[in-house]
Amino acid sequence: IPAMFEKGMEYGVSHMFIASWNRKGFDCNYPEYYPDMELGTAMDICRGIDAVNRRGGFATFYINARLFDLESDFFEPVGRKMAIKDETGEILTEQYGPVRFSLNCPSDEQWQKQLIDTAVFSAKAYGLRGIYLDQLGSAEPFACYDRTHSHGNIGEYNQGYVRVLSEIKRQMQANNPDAFLMTENCGDIYGSYTWGNLTWNGADYDEYYNMFKYTFP
């Protein structure tokens, strides 16, 4: 991490945005966010981020905001309960590369707590200033018909993520007033909670992206 940071500083870049730090790498094993042993120990990551901070830089870690690996040991006892269910009670799934995931319900307190705690813990434990929540501002919202969930009706998807963003930001900034959140792409109801947005495919895939860009230049 320090070596990569120093290389970035040669180009005037002081922000390290780190993905694939978790066990098994990118788009795999979510939401189990533990350092991949090939990259070193958890303390190695702490030392690396501390070196970045001491050099006047800052770091952001990637966390996916909605996926649960179906092959995870914890999917059946934990993940299935958190999943969005359709009208027939079936879980919604998506596939990225060879890995298939369930879609977690952001308007249910179970997934809210898991996501909030994971983000806040990562920021505190590793000395991060930022947390990036992938897919949050980009992926399609879905209705959830699971009657065991805490949401009052089937259409609270976006309101659930507003609570998640608000609570993560509040807790992170209580520990570090300069802490921030980022999301993939952007949305008007999420924008006031974020410091930045990764908008790599918004123009091609997100509805009303050009209207958003015009309104919020």
Residue ranges and their predicted role:
Residues 70, 74-113, 159-217:
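Glycan-recognition surfaces
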Residues 2-116, 126-130, 136-150:
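Aromatic-lined carbohydrate-binding/catalytic grooves of carbohydrate-active enzymes
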